[in-house]
Amino acid sequence: MIGWLLDTNVIAALINRNGAPSVKNWAATQDETCMFLSILTLGEYDKGIENLPPDDPNRYVYGAARDALEERFSGRVLSLTDNCVRRWGAISGRVKLATSHAPPVIDTMLAATAIEHDLYLVTRNVKDTRFSGAAVFDPWSDDPARFPLSGK
């Protein structure tokens, strides 16, 4: 694997001053240029902002945080390509067949994106991605030494 695709729950832990120490410690040891976001993560921020009442002062705070995140990851925000979407379809079908439950769309889209770009998927949602075929790293509980980067 050449890098890390960060799920929204990882970003939340990193930017929250009370976020999980294990997540913060792991991230502090990584080369940030090897960290990527999916456009879906920015979309999840947009969804959260739009769920707030129009006069909620947090709309501005969360909007500024979302914009700062997009700027910080400039050039490292991955779009959904045709290959990612086709891989997502295959993953979703296999996971549903294996578990008898339809997997969460965003989690399996992230898994497909990670596979397409040779990245570890960094998430706490291991249960939702375990049959995806993606290499999944949970910074809340996994040993980082078991997830080496191979270089670009």
Task: Set out the residue ranges of the language-model regions.
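Acidic, PIN/NYN-like endoribonuclease modules and their adjacent C-terminal/linker elements
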Residues: 109-111, 115-152
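Short secondary-structure boundary/capping segments
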Residues: 2, 26-29, 68-69, 77, ...
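Alpha-helix capping/helix-boundary segments
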Residues: 10-11, 41, 84, 110, ...
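Residues at the C-termini of beta-strands that transition into short coil/loop
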Residues: 39-40, 81, 125, 140
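Short, well-structured N-terminal submotif of metal-dependent ribonuclease cores
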Residues: 1-41, 50-68, 143-150
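Residues that scaffold the ATP/ADP-binding catalytic core of kinase and kinase-like folds
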Residues: 13-14, 48, 88-91, 132, ...
